Amino acid sequence: MIDSTAFWAKEYKLGGFRFDLMALHDIETMNLLTAKLKTINEGIVVYGEPWDAGGSSLTGNFAAKQTNGNRFEGYGQFNDQARDALIKSGMNGKADKGWVNNSTSAASP
């Protein structure tokens, strides 16, 4: 994964990578991958979905998941809690309002 993304960044001059289900990867690999990419392009963007679709063999502090975000080095994650507080509706087929849609009960982002 590290070699592949480095190749694509060099060869195709890609400016960023987005990882679906990033929590299926371990933090160490994601940190190494990001560090390698930053040597190629210090402004490269790396981010992903910090969830695992309901299961992973990685346990505790090893997975690149939302609750371990403080250990991410140089890359980011989606924040579904902030998203839901801001826009709410549409994510689960509900018509609930979020903060942006003038909800008075939505948590502040």
Region spans (language model):
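Active-site-proximal helices and loops of the catalytic beta/alpha 8
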Residues: 21-109
